[in-house]
Every structure is written in C-alpha cells, then in structure tokens.
Amino acid sequence: TGRGSAYNEYEYIGFGITLDQGRDMLAEAEELLIKAWTGKNIDHHGHYWQSKFPELRPRPYQKPHPPLVRACISEASVAEMAKVGRPVLIGVQTVDTLRHRLDLYRDIMHDAKFSDSQVEYSLDQTWVQRGLVVAESDQEAQDIAGPALDRYRKHLLDARLNYNTSEVPVVDPSRPRPPGEVLEQAFLAGTPRRVAEQVDELRDIGARNVMLNANVGQIELQHVERTLRLFGEQVIPKFKDA
C-alpha cells in the first residue's frame, strides 16, 4: 500500500488544510491504518482523527497487514523510513543523490539493528523514478523528451499560479530547477542501447527497481507506443538474468 503526502500546496486546498498540516497528518494516518488492519474494537484518539469501530471487514489477506511503502522526495523522509525498515519510492534525483540516499538508507537500517536479510528485502522493494523515451536515435529521443518536460513544467507552474493561495510564496524563476525538471536527470532517453546503459548506471549505484513514466507531459501516442515496444523488445531482455 502506497502512502505519500503531496508536494503542491493546491493539492490540499480542496481539503481545507495546508501542505504543512498534511505532512503532520501522514504519520497519524498510517498509525490508524495499521490499527484498522490488525486490531479489533478500535478506539483511536489522535490529534487529527477520532475513530471508534469494532473491526475492519473484510480483513486484509496479507498478514499481519499489507506492506506500507512511502513516496519520498526529501532525504529526511528516506531516513525516517529506513529507521522503521520500510521500503521507499524515491522521486527523481541525480544519480549521485540517489547513490547517497540508497547508501544512507542501508546504513540507517543497519544502525537500527535490522538483519542483513531485512535490509536486502527492503532494498529489493525500493524504487527510483525516471521518465522514459526510446527512439531510433539519441537526438530524436531528446527532441521528444525535451518539449514534453517543458509542457510538464509549465503545467505545474500554471497550476501553482492559478490555484495556490496568495499566502504561498511564488517560486523564484531564477532558482535552479529541481532534478525532476532537468532533462538529463528526469529521463532515460535515447536508443535502446543508450537507455540500457542508463539503466546499468542506476543498477551500479544500487537501484534495484525503476518506476518509468513513458508519457510525461502528454507525449504523442505513437511515440509512447514506440517507447513501450522498443523498451520491451530491446531493453528488458538485457536485464532478464540480472
């Protein structure tokens, strides 16, 4: 089960709360979720929720409860999850940052006295994120991914300008872009051979799973379909025995 706090203020406005309140609510939401999955005669008195019910039906099939996975952008969130041995979904970061965070995650789990097998299990369930464009040439892939990322970034900026309240500071356009808005960091893009090299690079730093988005910024359907076909036929087979 995935849980994540959103990262845009406007995503909270419809619920009548702020982004900071949403972050504070996350821990209690997970606590209540586990109580509901595992307990009976639930009587929860928290800061945000007051809940009382006999039990959840039907009961979860997985025991003691479905595994929880949290989407994490910040290093602090990754460290927090490592302390409790929970897998994470890491948003787009540079290769060097990913290497550091995966090493940090492993070290913190060991410091928290998790066994080697528990650390390996959590790393096996941890994912990193990238966009994906596979084409006949590296240049064509860049020509598709670049404008797509620009459209995606414009959508985010427009939504923040249109829907954030006046109390929310406007992002300084001169500030360096975060990794998720930088083409070379946000995408695996190129020929099947080049994309396989990029996957290899992620594997070499300790990433074991990659969440891929083949339609960042409303890429045209024929390009999305070609990406999926080329990736499935010419990239995935290179890693089947890995």
What is the role of each PLM region?
Residues 137, 219-230, 240:
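Short glycine/threonine-rich loop-to-helix capping motif typified by GTGT followed
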Residues 6-17, 83-84:
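Acidic/polar active-site rim loop that often engages polyanionic ligands
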Residues 73-96, 101-102:
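A conserved active-site cap/scaffold subdomain adjacent to cofactor or substrate pockets
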Residues 92-95, 213-225:
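Glycine-rich, proline-tolerant flexible connector loops at the mouths of alpha/beta enzymes
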Residues 5-9, 94, 132-134, 216-218:
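Active-site-proximal loop/turn and secondary-structure-junction residues that shape catalytic pockets
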Residues 20-56, 96-208, 240-242:
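An alpha-helical appendage that flanks or caps ligand/catalytic pockets
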Residues 1-3, 68-71, 88-91, 124-131, ...:
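Hydrophobic faces of well-ordered beta-strands that scaffold small-molecule active sites
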